[in-house]
């Protein structure tokens, strides 16, 4: 199954942390193309005032792991990178891994929704995702990733930080 994963970090040595996470994702990858966007340095969204800038990217890989197995693997990697178990939403973090989609699968569980319900409202996910899969249309989407990116880019005051 093809799985899309968002990566983010805004604490510590962000590039090194994401590089390490990408290495672990390559271990999960089984065959075919391993797609990796560039890393975008972005302003934090909905985080406490004064939160550091994020580095964000998106990976797509092939795996035989189930979505829940991927979720548990991601949680293990986040904890190993220094994320507390009781970490609140939208707080600064060393590593954040979000499962965005798995092929054309839909899932609605308390711990996991697929496709991720907030992709189309997050430019920091759509921009790197459009680099690797611009024409992707996920279940429930009326437009492609590139089209959603164009729409949201015009509505949000969002810039890639320099």
Model feature map: region roles:
Residues 39, 45-54, 65-162:
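Flexible, gly/pro- and Lys/Arg-enriched active-site loops
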Residues 1-3, 21-27, 35, 62-68, ...:
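Generic detector of short, locally flexible boundary/turn motifs and exposed helical patches
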Residues 7-9, 63, 130:
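Short, structured patches in soluble enzyme cores that scaffold and shape functional sites
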Residues 1-31, 36-43:
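N-terminal beta1-alpha1 ligand-phosphate binding loop
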């Amino acid at each position: 199954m093809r799985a899309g994963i968002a990566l983010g970090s805004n604490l510590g040595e962000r590039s090194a942390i994401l590089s390490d996470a990408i290495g672990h994702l390559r271990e999960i990858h089984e065959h075919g193309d391993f797609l990796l966007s560039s890393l975008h340095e972005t302003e934090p969204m909905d985080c406490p005032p004064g939160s550091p800038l994020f580095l964000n990217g998106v990976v797509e890989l092939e795996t035989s792991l189930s979505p829940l197995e991927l979720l548990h693997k991601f949680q293990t990697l986040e904890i190993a990178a220094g994320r507390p178990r009781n970490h609140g939403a939208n707080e600064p973090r060393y590593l954040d891994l979000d499962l965005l989609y798995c092929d054309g699968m839909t899932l609605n569980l308390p711990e996991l929704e697929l496709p991720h319900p907030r992709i189309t409202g997050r430019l920091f996910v759509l921009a790197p995702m459009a680099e690797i899969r611009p024409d992707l249309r996920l279940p429930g989407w009326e437009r492609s990733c590139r089209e959603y990116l164009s729409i949201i880019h015009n509505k949000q005051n969002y810039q890639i930080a320099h």
